[in-house]
Amino acid sequence: MSLRRALAALAAVLSMALPVGGQAQSMSPEQRQPLNAAERWLVTVDAERYANAWAMAAESFKASVPQKEFRDGIRRIRQDYGRVVLRKSEKIGFVGEAPKPDDPTGAAKEGMQIAILFDTKFAGSKRATEEMSVVLGKDGLWRVAGYYIR
């Protein structure tokens, strides 16, 4: 799938996502895991530790974006926006099929994907929407599989 198609699919999912707002505080630790993974990754990018951010990403991300290309691209984008002043998660939703309420395990399954939108204010009063997807890996950890800023 091309990057453009993937971003279009992510945008479509996010348009149907649920607002996070005050929900983040009432989420269980398991429900917060994808959001926590996205936030940790963003903090790493904010600190300009681009090699670490690339290493933290999902295998699908690393396979589609070579480390040097990621580093150069994210550095250029972040220089245009400046430092982060405030970031707030706005929406979160499943990509594809959500877990079934009657599933006795209630557990997230490998390959499950979550889309997250952040409303971010940068230095110089620039605002942007950061769109992310995180995927549950074989190791049981949530990792960033996609990132787009607009």
Predicted regions mapped to residue ranges:
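Internal amphipathic alpha-helical segments of the cytochrome P450 catalytic fold
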Residues: 50-51, 141
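Exposed beta-sheet edge and beta->alpha loop/turn motif
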Residues: 92-150
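Short solvent-exposed beta->alpha transition segments
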Residues: 35-36, 40, 51-111
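Short charge-dense sequence patches
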Residues: 22-28, 80-85, 130
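Short, low-complexity N-terminal intrinsically disordered segments enriched in polar/charged residues
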Residues: 3, 12, 19-49, 55
